Structure formats: C-alpha cells, structure tokens
Amino acid sequence: MSTSAVLFLLLAVFAAGASAATFNIKNNCGSTIWPAGIPVGGGFELGSGQTSSINVPAGTQAGRIWARTGCSFNGGSGSCQTGDCGGQLSCSLSGRPPATLAEFTIGGGSTQDFYDISVIDGFNLAMDFSCSTGDALQCRDPSCPPPQAYQHPNDVATHACSGNNNYQITFCP
C-alpha cells in the first residue's frame, strides 16, 4: 500500500472519531457584550438576552472564548475595556486581561473533548460553561475554586466530555 493511501486511511479513522461541536453563547448580562474566540469564532456583538452560536471543527486545540465589555467599534476597529484583542472586532489573538475564559479542545482524546473555565488571565464576567453530557462549570466571582476554574497554572480543573456534543456558555448567569 502506498504511503499516501496509508496516510489517507489514518486521517479517515481519526476524523471518524471526532466531530465538530456547536457552542451556544448566551448573554444574560444587563448590557451588550462582544464575545470573541480563537482560533475560531472571531468576534461579534451580542445584545442583552441574545444567544448566538459558533461551530468549532473537530481537532481544534487550545480554543478560547471570552466576552469583551465596554467596547466601541467603527468599521471593525475600536477598543474594549476588558478582553480587548488588538482593537479588532474579529479576534485573531487572545484578549488582554482581565478576561474570564472558556477553554476547550475538540476531539483531543480522539473520541473525547476537554473543557474548562480559566481566571488565570483575570475575571471580567461570571460564566457558566457546560457540555451537553458532562459537568456544568460555574464561575461567578474572581475566587471561583478548582475544580470549577483554573486560578493558577497547576490547578486541576479540566473536564472531559464525550465527542459529538454541544456546549453552552452563559455570561452573567
């Protein structure tokens, strides 16, 4: 069997074990927020009480979603009081602290996803983060304890979820 055929078969097996995930993002805050995500999701405006979804492909590693606050944009450029990412509406780099982070890897364990909340970069908004078949994580203030959220790099706060699931992130739950 040729090398390219073996490579194709390996990729097909890996792809069969991991699926994309939908992240539903809800704004329960009393004001508009601007969710951002890397390496997928970019950034967008989300009014109070609104929900939006982003699709995250299988194989996404070290993904992050956070809410920016106090933003002003004109033509895709501007600034935010918290979580700003270089003055751009659509982020391609991490947000400036403070920012409460939803972190994830989709299909990182072949048939498992991994997810957590982190306040290592500071806390700007309360957050709930859940997998449709896993643990519901809650971080309501800057001192949310492990295993609910990472406060320090050596904390144990990563949770596993079987693949083929969707996620819910709620800001200001």
Swiss-Prot record:
GO terms for biological process: defense response. Residues 1-20 form the signal peptide. The keyword Phosphoprotein does not apply. It comes from the Eukaryota. Pfam families: Thaumatin (PF00314). InterPro entries: Osmotin/thaumatin-like_sf, Thaumatin, Thaumatin_CS. SUPFAM superfamilies: Osmotin, thaumatin-like protein. PROSITE patterns: THAUMATIN_1 (PS00316), THAUMATIN_2 (PS51367). Keywords: Pathogenesis-related protein, Plant defense, Signal. The keyword Lipoprotein does not apply. Belongs to the thaumatin family. PANTHER family: OS03G0233200 PROTEIN. This is Pathogenesis-related protein 1C. It comes from Hordeum vulgare.
